[in-house]
Amino acid sequence: MSSDVKDSSHLEKQNSQEYSNSKQNGEIDIMEMLPQKKMYIIEKQFDQSGKGLKIDEFVRVMLTHLDFDKSDVQKEDQITLALIDLFKEIDVNGDGTMEWEEFSDHIISLGLLRNDRSFKNVIKNYFPSEHIKDNQKHETPIEKIVYFDKLKYLVVLEKDSTRFKVYNANTAELYYEVNAHKCAVLDAEYIPDQNLIATSSNDLTINFWDSSFFIPKQIVSVPEIQLCMRYAKWSTQSQPTYLYTGGSDSIIHIYDTKTLKEKGTIGGWNPFFKRDSQQYGHASPIGDILPINIQTTLVTAGLDANICLWDAATHLPKKELRGHEKGVYSLDWSDFSPMNQCLLSAGLDHEAFVWNTYVKEKIFLLRGHNHPLIGVKCLPGTPQVITADINGMVKVWDVRNFLCMQTINVPTDELNSFVVTSNQKKRIIFGARRLYYYEYDEPKDQMLTDEKMCLRVLYNSVLLCLITLHPDCIKVWDIRTGKLQSVYRELSTAELTVCVLDTRKRKLFVGDADGNIFTVNIKNGAKMKKFEKHNNRMITDLTHWTSKKPATIEIGGDDDDEDGTGDSRRVVSCSREETVFIHDEDSSDPSRSCRYKMKQHKSSVNSLSLKQDSELFASASDDGNIVITNLNSYRQETLPSTQYPFEKKKVIFLDPYNALVTSDSEGYVHFYCVNNGKARTRYLLTKKYETTSVVNNKVDKFPVTHLAFNSDNNMLLLSDELGNVTIWDLTIFLKKLDEIKDDNIQQQKTKQAQTPLKQTPNRASNGFFPTELDELKQINEKQISLSQMDNLEKYFQDKDIAFVHQLKGAHNDGITWIEVLKEYNMFATSSFDCCCHLWSFNDYKKMGSLILGHDIMNNNWQLRVDEEKRKVDAQYYMEKLKKKLNKDDQSDDEEKNSQKQDESMMSDKNFDQKNQKKPKKTEKGEKGEKAPEKPLPEKKKVLTAQEKMEQNKKLKNELKLEFDPALLNLNKNKKQVLSEKEQIEKASELLEKVKKFNDVIANKNKDRRNPLEIDYDDFLRAYQMDEQVDIYLDQNEEEEEDNNILYDLDDPKNQSIPAGAYTSKGAFKSKNIGRKNKI
């Protein structure tokens, strides 16, 4: 019998309601909404950021490109929450950003899951029913089976028989045998609104029978043999109910179920009849008819290999699907979820076709049969598709990935028909010489967590689930209901042995019996990364360490510490060998992931424990030693030996205290004080773990199988191989531990810094040093402290650890793991007895169990989650994110409007400057007299003032655009950058003032042959250099009034400046120009 158990059947019972429930809960499937045509645009948005998108940037990009009604605020909020969850799901490593490679890899991984057997909710195996047998005699082979779900009837039609038999579908009990027609019965259909069963025959009649007592109600004559029939109740406005029949004349007839009269044939015309002038229709006998109510579409298949789609309201043709080479006589519709809706067809071809009704091409072929198929069926509410051929080969497919999950060979020479039932058992019933029943493999005990032992149970506070580890699978359970959510199978070829959560609780690190280590995504079961393999030795324990706490994703945060970058992430593994591997989680090469191999032990390493918020981990070995290792320096320290040199099986840090507990193979529990830094680790106490033996009913010590600590109430939980759980109270022990004066240098400095001023030693009134009395007190305190340190074994006593309670017989076999759920004040246990239970710290009563049975109400699951608080937190986070997005959008809009205004002003200014009339400049100024031209020197060409000014005017527009906003800053104390509009205005003012100044100088020097030539390019460069020095080098200098040179250049007519003052570049390096009194 298969090891797959009732878990999947329970899953599939829920799957049909998953989509509707998710809609009611407001969950959105982002991947379903993702437009493939916009993927290239989205990729560009990722590339522009350079370092990836933060969560607010990611949400903005996705909200822009997702297909939904942007005016629907409620829909936008739901999508925003879904995008936040998606970001956290993809950002498994927690670096706070998402690059395009991560996003695209996530999408690809969803597709790869179609080819991965570890995909969740794996279909269960079928096996022949041991309880249901067909004991009836069949004179001829069974030609066809028809199942009526509402009646739970199975109508059996035998080859060339005028009778039909009615069975109880659940028990195979024969109810009726009806003498129905004069010739062979071909098909049967149930009409629920009239409580009738219709049968068709070779005698050219359709008979209608009362479904309760099979009394004939009406006989309808037909012109041709009707090979198939199908009832349909359409969800259109009038909600008509029809009986469709397909004849050997390739015509489809319509009958009104209320009047049982034919409808749709008027004057010999039938819309389904294919004429030479028509493009659609059938030219051969009809093989099958299928109404798809959700699409108001009628699908017909014929022996001409065509599949036709018709509008349900008008019965006009919609589409024709071509691809089959031979006749088609079986159709079915899969509606497992909106993402998996598809049409399936089968016939004389050896493959079943999968269609999307919106396109004409097939989307997949279900291959694997070597003979013509007899049909294709979908199990309602499940992802299962069944195909069978005439040779008796049956295949079970998963419609989510189109993989063949199981192959069944029915023991018969020729298989003719089969049906599937929608009851709890999901039976498949085959018709050959007799009926063959196949059903799900059911566990004998439905109160189990799995048919195989439960090795670990872990609590995930982020995803609100419990995770159980079994030798061949990992199961995920909803913490709110105790129901099974997902099953991940075939993760490894070897048996799974250990697993541990990462610090962000988004993935699992898993080890197996062959020494393999890999990570699994908890959300979808995808295997993500492998690590260096141990030498074919079973992995005994794993732990995960991050150099700092998991970063919370801040909205728009720029702190490097918040994005998670620069973290050191390590995976520590041990196995049935003496070496402990320290892996680099970020290593890209699995074969070289190990950064360090710790070989301090001399035998098998059994257990690991990480001290939270530190760099230390402890390892316990069969050599009797406990080794403390620093994950950064790899410094190692072996704990002091005790008088009990037995094999160490378990080790645990009592976080947040500086204490460690270990158990050995003889039932002794040892307590140590562990100090950080260079201080020594000290042995404190040993206590025996005792319980009552089942064999002789005597109290004796037993090995401890697992240790767990609850820091909220200082309770230590211990389990044994008898299935008991014992609780010890460590309050007194931990109080004494705090009283010990720690000689750690760093902790001494911290304590001294926190010492109140009134507790400091008294100082002499005339000096700095303490008095002699103070020194004696300090010496005495040190002596007491040292005395305590030397006699710690006497200071700590057995009575410091108080017995609280023992759960006798919590399990029927040895307990493998204890998981503390602090926020609910509960703990969970797993065992070799294949069970997992939940317990309360208040009264130590069972609060529920993780079970396979369908009836979860009997489980009495009592854990309650504060959903409102989680919703409020999610809503607050979303509102905060939306405010950030709105603020950024407003800034973008203002910047765009400013750019448009600047571009408009630049255009207007350029137009005015080009059309402005410029007066001719002469040597005599405004009189207009021409000056004699003087030839330029031959050696060096010198431009005249007029030519120079014309050249500078041509550069005017370019200079305006080259101005740096920081160089025109008029208030350097505030360090505000001018807008582009102010840039252009100030640049224009500067050039106009320089132009006026040039005119003044030229007029004052009109007696000279050549006017003063001002190099405007040099002027502006010198000006820019001056401003750069002020802004960037002296930005911390505080000045009362530090005005730009632009304000120092008042109207040149009101200044008395000697000629030649601006003839050198160095003249402009002085920022402040003294003003003279007005003339």
From Swiss-Prot:
UniProt KW Repeat keyword: yes
Record carries keyword Iron-sulfur: no
Region: Disordered, residue numbers: 1-27, 883-943
Subcellular location: Cell projection, Cilium
Key words, A-Z: Calcium, Cell projection, Repeat, WD repeat
Ranges annotated as biased composition (Basic and acidic residues): 1-15, 922-943
Gene Ontology MF terms: calcium ion binding
Binding site for Ca(2+): D91, N93, D95, T97, E102
Residue ranges of domain EF-hand in the record: 78-113
Broad class of the protein's primary localization: other
Assembly and interaction partners: Associates with components of the nexin-dynein regulatory complex (N-DRC) and the CFAP184:CFAP263 complex.
Name used for this protein in its record: Cilia- and flagella-associated protein 337 A
Gene: CFAP337A
